[in-house]
Every structure is written in structure tokens, then in C-alpha cells.
Design a protein with these regions (language model features):
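Short pre-active-site segment immediately N-terminal to the catalytic Zn-binding motif
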Residues: 3-19
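Flexible glycine/proline-enriched surface loops and loop-helix/loop-strand junctions
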Residues: 8, 44-50, 93-94, 108-109
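Flexible loop/turn segments at secondary-structure boundaries
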Residues: 9-10, 24-25, 31-36, 188-189
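Catalytic glutamate of the conserved HExxH
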Residues: 17, 21-27, 31, 61
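Post-HExxH zinc-binding segment in Zn-dependent metallohydrolases
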Residues: 30-32, 36-37, 42-82
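Active-site metal-coordination segments of metallo-dependent hydrolases
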Residues: 48-60, 101-102, 151-160
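Long, amphipathic alpha-helical stalk/connector segments used for oligomerization, subunit docking
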Residues: 60, 67-147
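C-terminal, non-catalytic "cap/extension" segments appended to globular domains
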Residues: 131-209
């Protein structure tokens, strides 16, 4: 696991970073699919991870969901108990508020991608918009726009913004479904179909006994 240190890693996102990149996020997904799909089933396509594909949408979505799966929607108290002995400042109320707002504000960066690549807005203008509407410091806004203008990664942000709500709706609090994300060859359409079926069942009138 490599951590980008161009900007300081904030304590507010430390637990999410660990869960996303290691366990139960990217690392177990790659290892379980390597063993279950590539070695056992010989589905060689699973040995290749292509950027900007539906595979990435699910990979980033499940990784972003990882902390929530193991600690629930409000993990701050547990995280604080681990960080306090290390002398890392971690205000649970602030982190909870930032987490809620931060997820919603993720759409600001996705809109910034459209501003850059569809509207033709210049980087300086979009950096200012990301700082203002995304509630980011100028340095972090500039880093976000740098990511959005990179030839390889400029569309990748969609994997985070759209992947998390899709995977969360699919898992719906069921660890067995999260295990499916880690282990099976799924597509966004498969998840959408399951979500639609779940909603249809919940909306169906109860049958008389």
C-alpha cells in the first residue's frame, strides 16, 4: 500500500484510508478473486484490472464501503479508541459531521470534471469552484483538479461518486452480499437488478395469512 504524501493525511480520513486500501477493501478483493476466479476457475480476464471500466466502479465502491461494513455507519468512537493511544487527535463529533458532508460534496468534484471536459472551463476557474463548493483548501482543490486533468485518471472520480451508493444499496447491511462483491465477477447491471428486486419485494403488499 502506497500513500500519497503530497498533502498531509488527515486523521479524519485515516480509518477510511486503511479500510479502503487494505482490509476489507482492495486487498481482499484482489486476493479472493485471484484465488477463486483466476486460479480455480481460470477466468484469466480477472487477472487484468483495466482503468475506467465497470470493474473499477465496483472496486472503488466496495472499498469506500469497507469501513461502514466492519464498523457501521458511525464508526467514530471505535476509531477514536484506536487512535488515542497513538496520540492522534480525533474529534468524533467533527469527524461524523465531516463524513456526512464529505460524501454529499463528492458530487462537486464530479461536476468539476464536466466543467473541464464538457464545458471547456479552464483549470484555474474550476479550482476556484471546487474550493468554494467542495469546501476545500486551495491546495486540496488544486490537487483534485490535477487528478481530473490527468490523461489516465480524469474520468476515474466517477468510480467513487457513483460506486459507493450503488454498492451500499446492493449490500443493504448484509455481509454476505459484501462478500459477493469481494469474490464474484459482478457488473453494475447485476447490482441494479438486485436492488430493483429488493425494492419490489419491500413495496409488495403483505400476503394474508
Amino acid at each position: 500500500m502506497a500513500v500519497n504524501t503530497d498533502l498531509p493525511v488527515l486523521s479524519t480520513g485515516l480509518a477510511h484510508l486503511v479500510a479502503h486500501e487494505s482490509y476489507p477493501g482492495h486487498h481482499p478483493e484482489h486476493t479472493r478473486k485471484e484465488v477463486g476466479l483466476v486460479r480455480r476457475r481460470q477466468w484469466w480476464e480477472e487477472s487484468i484490472f483495466l482503468v475506467g471500466t465497470p470493474q473499477c466502479l465496483l472496486a472503488e465502491g466496495l472499498a469506500d464501503l469497507g469501513l461502514e461494513v466492519v464498523m457501521g455507519r458511525r464508526p467514530e468512537a471505535v476509531v477514536a479508541s484506536h487512535l488515542a493511544p497513538l496520540g492522534i487527535r480525533y474529534d468524533t463529533e467533527v469527524v461524523a459531521a465531516v463524513s456526512e458532508a464529505g460524501e454529499a460534496l463528492g458530487a462537486v468534484r464530479q461536476n468539476a470534471a464536466f466543467r473541464l471536459h464538457e464545458d471547456g472551463a479552464d483549470s484555474d476557474t474550476v479550482t476556484g469552484e471546487v474550493a468554494r463548493w467542495g469546501l476545500l483548501s486551495p491546495d486540496r482543490a488544486a490537487k483534485a483538479v490535477e487528478f481530473l486533468t490527468h490523461p489516465t485518471w480524469r474520468a476515474y472520480l466517477t468510480c467513487y461518486v457513483e460506486g459507493l451508493p450503488l454498492c451500499r444499496s446492493f449490500v443493504h447491511g448484509d455481509p454476505a452480499r459484501f462478500e459477493r462483491l469481494l469474490s464474484e465477477q459482478l457488473t453494475p447491471d447485476v447490482l441494479q437488478d438486485q436492488i430493483a428486486a429488493d425494492r419490489a419485494r419491500s413495496a409488495a403488499p403483505a400476503q394474508p395469512v
